[in-house]
């Protein structure tokens, strides 16, 4: 099930509420990524404490390891990973297409060599729907081909992007048909493709709208294209998505990208950036970014962000985080991840409040001014 309530708007920015089988999600929302069934360096308890409402699981990786038999023995992903709130799973398409020369695409689906042991495997819209039914995720994504920005070292042509998008549309219908055949009680999202071409994005959305998905995602962005192209496509597509359905921007991005996405009409975001950057010592704060390995932090007694109420900022100095990073302590990665995810989730809390109070434009200006202090 999925129920979407649009509470209020401020320009194109939307304040909404998504009710799913495992709980309610207040939007706009950022969704931490748990590729293998865990958000790296975080326990479910810590995710709850920082206010995570929904997390991502990766269909492709969970299918390969631990395998569906293991997840099925736990009656789904929620019990297996000890998380009782909503979960969104991607379709596995992006990971398969990332394999490059190791895979072969046909109308039926994709044949590829397992990155785990080299076994020959096949993934199709039907198989993706079957895997996601076993995972029992609250939001299921259609199986699609993520149109690359570059093909053979040059931007994809209109013809190449059109061919890819139209196959994704045919796969969308097959995904929906299999989802319904399985009597899946959860929600299914369609994915708008079309590369950097607005007319192809419009064609994709028109085709998906006929299939009446529970929600709509924008795919194929943040795949290597210049930022101005990403924003051009985002600002074209997001306001055109059905107003009565949730809007999800896949795999994006920086704090600035999230705020720009909200301004365009996006409700849901995911990205590995806050967790991956945390492990590499790159931290996001209200007043710009912090590279904790820099020598300037060696004797700094201040918290990362004096305006932040996360466990890391309440208890530890920049000097201590610098020390942990320099000596390679696991605790450093954990404390950094707690902070970065808290920052992203707090940013979304402030965005929701600003939309409710119809001051999102002012919020956006202040956000940009604060973040413009740059990297320390």
UniProtKB/Swiss-Prot annotation:
Residues binding substrate, per UniProt: 90-94, 144, 193, 220
EC number from the UniProt entry: 2.4.2.29
Binding site for Zn(2+): 308, 310, 313, 339
Leading EC class: transferase
An MF annotation (GO) of this entry: metal ion binding
Known catalytic reactions: 7-aminomethyl-7-carbaguanine + guanosine(34) in tRNA = 7-aminomethyl-7-carbaguanosine(34) in tRNA + guanine
Region feature RNA binding, mapped onto this chain: 251-257, 275-279
Signal peptide: none
InterPro entries: ArchSynthase1/Queuine_TRR, TGT, TGT-like_sf, tRNA_ribo_trans-like
Pathway in which the depicted protein is active: tRNA modification; tRNA-queuosine biosynthesis
GO biological process terms on file: queuosine biosynthetic process; tRNA wobble guanine modification; tRNA-guanine transglycosylation
Cofactor field: Zn(2+)
Keywords: Glycosyltransferase, Metal-binding, Queuosine biosynthesis, Transferase, tRNA processing, Zinc
Cofactor note as given: Binds 1 zinc ion per subunit.
Enzyme active site: 90 (proton acceptor), 270 (nucleophile)
GO CC, alphabetical: cytosol
Job description of the protein: Catalyzes the base-exchange of a guanine (G) residue with the queuine precursor 7-aminomethyl-7-deazaguanine (PreQ1) at position 34 (anticodon wobble position) in tRNAs with GU(N) anticodons (tRNA-Asp, -Asn, -His and -Tyr). Catalysis occurs through a double-displacement mechanism. The nucleophile active site attacks the C1' of nucleotide 34 to detach the guanine base from the RNA, forming a covalent enzyme-RNA intermediate. The proton acceptor active site deprotonates the incoming PreQ1, allowing a nucleophilic attack on the C1' of the ribose to form the product.
PANTHER family in the record: QUEUINE TRNA-RIBOSYLTRANSFERASE
Family indicated by similarity: Belongs to the queuine tRNA-ribosyltransferase family.
Name of the protein: Queuine tRNA-ribosyltransferase
Organism: Cupriavidus taiwanensis (strain DSM 17343 / BCRC 17206 / CCUG 44338 / CIP 107171 / LMG 19424 / R1) (Ralstonia taiwanensis (strain LMG 19424))
Gene this protein is translated from: tgt
């Amino acid at each position: 099930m999925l129920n979407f309530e649009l509470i209020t708007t401020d320009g194109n920015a939307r304040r909404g509420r998504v009710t799913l089988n495992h709980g309610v999600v207040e939007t706009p929302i950022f969704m931490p990524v748990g590729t293998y069934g865990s958000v790296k360096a975080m326990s479910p308890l810590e995710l709850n404490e920082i206010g995570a409402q929904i997390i991502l699981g990766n269909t492709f990786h969970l299918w390969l390891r631990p395998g569906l038999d293991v997840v099925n023995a736990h009656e789904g992903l929620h019990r297996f990973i000890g998380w009782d709130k909503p979960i969104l799973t991607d379709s596995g398409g992006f990971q398969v297409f990332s394999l490059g020369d190791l895979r072969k695409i046909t109308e039926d689906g994709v044949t590829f060599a397992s990155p785990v042991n080299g076994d020959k495997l096949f993934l199709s819209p039907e198989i993706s729907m079957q895997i996601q039914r076993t995972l029992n995720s609250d939001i299921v994504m259609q199986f699609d081909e993520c149109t690359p920005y570059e093909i053979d070292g040059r931007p994809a042509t209109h013809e190449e992007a059109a061919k890819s998008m139209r196959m994704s549309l045919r796969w969308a219908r097959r995904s929906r048909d299999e989802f319904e055949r399985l009597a899946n009680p959860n929600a299914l999202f369609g994915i708008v493709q079309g590369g950097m071409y607005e007319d192809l994005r419009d064609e994709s959305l028109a085709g998906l709208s006929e299939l009446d998905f529970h929600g709509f995602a924008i795919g194929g962005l943040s795949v290597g294209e210049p930022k101005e192209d990403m924003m051009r496509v985002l600002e074209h597509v997001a306001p055109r998505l059905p107003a009565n359905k949730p809007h999800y921007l896949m795999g994006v991005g920086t704090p600035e990208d999230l705020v720009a996405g909200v301004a365009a009409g996006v409700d849901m975001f995911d990205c590995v950036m806050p967790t991956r950057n945390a492990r590499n010592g790159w931290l996001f704060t209200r007043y710009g970014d912090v590279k904790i390995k820099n020598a300037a932090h060696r004797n700094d007694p201040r918290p990362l962000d004096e305006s932040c109420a996360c466990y890391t900022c309440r208890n530890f100095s920049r000097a201590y985080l610098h020390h942990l990073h320099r000596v390679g302590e696991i605790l450093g990665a954990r404390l950094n991840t707690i902070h970065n995810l808290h920052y992203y989730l707090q940013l979304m809390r402030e965005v929701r409040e600003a939309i409710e109070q119809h001051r999102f434009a002012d919020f956006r200006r202040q956000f940009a001014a604060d973040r413009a202090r740059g990297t320390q």
